[in-house]
């Protein structure tokens, strides 16, 4: 078995895809910056270390998620992320 590596936003976001016991996922890191992500599947995003400030689709306010916290994003939408410190995350896809 091999792992697929992904790189986005000029190398500022990197991830490694894997198959968990229940769902496909990625484990990744984000550098300081602001990003807009598009989803293809329903996502469960957990901050492993650091923090992500997120504006979910339809929301008017930004919300910060710290290490150990999870947010969910519907499939086929875009969401915005602000990263103030290098952050590690786990994303599972449903």
From Swiss-Prot:
Gene Ontology cellular-component annotations: cytosol
Reaction(s) catalysed (UniProt annotation): a purine D-ribonucleoside + phosphate = a purine nucleobase + alpha-D-ribose 1-phosphate; adenosine + phosphate = alpha-D-ribose 1-phosphate + adenine; cytidine + phosphate = cytosine + alpha-D-ribose 1-phosphate; guanosine + phosphate = alpha-D-ribose 1-phosphate + guanine
InterPro entries linked: Ppnp, RmlC-like_jellyroll, RmlC_Cupin_sf
Keyword Calcium attached: no
Enzyme Commission number(s) of this protein: 2.4.2.1, 2.4.2.2
Gene Ontology terms for molecular function: guanosine phosphorylase activity; purine-nucleoside phosphorylase activity; thymidine phosphorylase activity; uridine phosphorylase activity
Keyword Lyase applies: no
Pfam families the UniProt entry points to: Ppnp
Keywords: Glycosyltransferase, Transferase
Stated family: Belongs to the nucleoside phosphorylase PpnP family.
Function: Catalyzes the phosphorolysis of diverse nucleosides, yielding D-ribose 1-phosphate and the respective free bases. Can use uridine, adenosine, guanosine, cytidine, thymidine, inosine and xanthosine as substrates. Also catalyzes the reverse reactions.
Name listed for the protein in its UniProt record: Pyrimidine/purine nucleoside phosphorylase
